[in-house]
C-alpha cells in the first residue's frame, strides 16, 4: 500500500501519533454518532477532532449510522435518515473533506433485497443532487450478505460520486455469504475506499491485521491488482502494532 492512500481511523487510541510517524491520513469517526452533528459534547473516550486535524493533512469523514437506513419503510425514519446524511455531507464539505463513508443500511430478515436496492437508489439520486462534483460518498457493507446488493445500487444510480467502501472485516463475519476476496472482486469496478481489520470469521472484532483468519497480505495484493487507486483505512483500536507488521511484511511503501 502506498502511504498517500492509507488512513487510520480515529477509533485508534494512538492514531494521531501513528499518523504523524508514518505520514498517513485520518478517518474521522467522531461523527458516527449522529448527536455530534447537532453539537453534542464528545464522549470521554473520543479523540478530540481538533487533535486529529493537527496530526495529518488528509481526511475521510465517517458519517452516522445508528438506526439509519435509506430503505426505511416508516416515512419518519426515512426523513431522519436523509436529514442525517445531509448533515454529514455538509459537515464534510465545510471541513474541506472530499470523501465520506456511510453505511449502506441493509437489515437481513427485514428488507427484501429488491426493495433495499430500489429504495436506496431513489434516496441517493435525490441526495446526490446537492453534492459537489468533487465529493465521493462511499457506501459501506455491514450486514449485507453479498456484494451484489451494493453493486446493484451503483448500477441503478450510475453516478461517479457514489461508490463503495468495502469493509473486508465485515465481509468475513457470519453476516456474509461469501469470502472477502469474492467481495473484493465483485466490488472492484465501483471501489473507492476499503476498511481493513481482522477477525476469526464469525464476529466483527476489529482485531489487529495479523490477529485473525484473514489473509491480509493476499487481500492487499488483490486490491492493488484490481483497484490500485482505492484508499484504505485501518479501523483498529491500536494502530502501531499493525503498522509495524505491514512494514515488516513490506506491505506499506
Residue ranges of each PLM-predicted region?
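A short acidic, helix-capping loop that chelates divalent metal ions and anchors anionic groups
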Residues: 35-36, 67-73, 107-112, 173-175, ...
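Active-site beta-loop-alpha junctions enriched in small/polar residues
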Residues: 9-13, 29-33, 64-66, 105-107, ...
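N-terminal pre-domain/capping segments
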Residues: 1-87
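Alpha-helix-loop-beta-strand connector modules within alpha/beta enzyme cores
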Residues: 48-66, 121-133, 216-223
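Histidine-acidic metal/acid-base catalytic patches
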Residues: 1-2, 17-19, 98, 147, ...
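Active-site acidic/histidine proton-transfer and metal-coordination neighborhood
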Residues: 71-163
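Charged helix-capping and loop-helix junction motifs
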Residues: 41-46, 77-86, 114-124, 176-186, ...
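Hydrophobic faces of well-ordered beta-strands that scaffold small-molecule active sites
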Residues: 3-9, 24-28, 59-63, 100-102, ...
Amino acid at each position: 500500500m502506498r502511504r498517500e492512500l492509507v488512513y487510520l481511523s480515529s477509533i485508534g487510541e494512538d492514531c494521531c501519533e501513528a499518523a504523524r510517524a508514518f505520514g498517513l491520513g485520518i478517518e474521522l469517526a467522531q461523527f458516527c454518532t449522529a448527536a455530534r452533528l447537532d453539537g453534542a459534547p464528545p464522549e470521554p473516550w473520543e479523540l478530540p477532532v481538533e487533535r486529529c486535524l493537527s496530526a495529518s493533512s488528509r481526511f475521510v469523514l465517517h458519517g452516522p449510522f445508528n438506526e439509519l437506513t435509506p430503505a426505511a419503510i416508516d416515512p419518519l425514519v426515512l426523513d431522519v435518515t436523509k436529514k442525517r446524511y445531509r448533515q454529514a455531507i455538509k459537515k464534510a464539505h465545510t471541513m474541506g473533506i472530499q470523501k465520506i463513508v456511510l453505511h449502506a443500511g441493509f437489515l437481513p430478515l427485514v428488507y427484501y433485497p429488491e426493495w433495499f436496492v430500489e429504495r436506496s437508489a431513489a434516496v441517493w439520486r435525490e441526495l446526490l443532487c446537492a453534492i459537489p462534483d468533487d465529493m465521493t460518498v462511499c457506501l459501506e457493507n455491514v450486514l449485507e450478505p453479498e456484494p451484489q446488493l451494493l453493486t446493484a445500487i451503483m448500477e441503478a444510480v450510475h453516478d461517479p460520486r457514489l461508490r463503495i467502501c468495502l469493509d473486508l472485516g465485515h465481509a468475513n463475519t457470519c453476516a456474509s455469504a461469501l469470502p472477502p476476496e469474492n467481495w473484493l472482486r465483485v466490488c472492484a469496478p465501483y471501489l473507492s475506499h476499503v476498511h481493513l481489520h481482522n477477525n476469526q470469521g464469525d464476529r466483527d472484532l476489529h482485531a489487529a491485521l495479523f490477529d485473525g483468519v484473514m489473509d491480509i497480505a493476499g487481500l492487499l495484493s488483490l486490491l492493488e491488482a484490481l483497484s490500485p487507486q482505492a484508499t484504505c483505512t485501518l479501523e483498529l483500536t491500536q494502530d502501531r502494532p499493525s503498522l509495524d507488521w505491514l512494514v515488516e511484511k513490506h506491505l506499506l511503501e
